[in-house]
Amino acid sequence: MVIFLAYFLVVNESEAFFGHLFKLATKIIPSLFQRKKERSVMNRDLENLFDPYQRNLEMDRLLKQLRNY
């Protein structure tokens, strides 16, 4: 591994290689934090979806219309 890194430090292609690694890191690192945020929102939505005590406002509106007829 050390020989591999030393080779890339000497050769001109090292700039492109490390530039590519840096570009990948800047895309991957923010996506890791974004996934956690999306997961927490999804979990909260699922908890609200399966909460038996939550009122369904759309259903209430339809039932009120039904009573009027």
Swiss-Prot record:
Keywords: Amidation, Antibiotic, Antimicrobial, Cleavage on pair of basic residues, Cytolysis, Fungicide, Hemolysis, Membrane, Secreted, Signal, Target cell membrane, Target membrane
Disulphide-bridged cysteine pairs: none
Expressed in which tissues: Expressed by the venom gland.
Keyword field contains Membrane: yes
Top-level taxon: Eukaryota
UniProt GO cellular component terms: extracellular region; membrane; other organism cell membrane
Residues excised as propeptide: 38-69
Signal peptide annotation: 1-16
Subcellular location: Secreted; Target cell membrane
GO biological process: defense response to bacterium; defense response to fungus; killing of cells of another organism
Domain comment, as recorded: Amphipathic and cationic peptide with an alpha-helical structure.
Family: Belongs to the non-disulfide-bridged peptide (NDBP) superfamily. Medium-length antimicrobial peptide (group 3) family.
Entry function: Amphipathic peptide that exhibits extensive cytolytic activities against both prokaryotic and eukaryotic cells. Acts by fastly disrupting the bacterial membrane. Is more potent against Gram-positive bacteria than against Gram-negative bacteria, and fungi (LC=25.1-8.3 uM). Shows potent activity against penicillin (MIC=3.0 uM) and methicillin (MIC=1.5-3.0 uM) resistant bacteria. Is lethal to the fungus Beauveria sp (LC=1.9 uM), a highly lethal pathogenic fungus to insects and resistant to many AMPs.
Protein name: Antimicrobial peptide Meucin-18
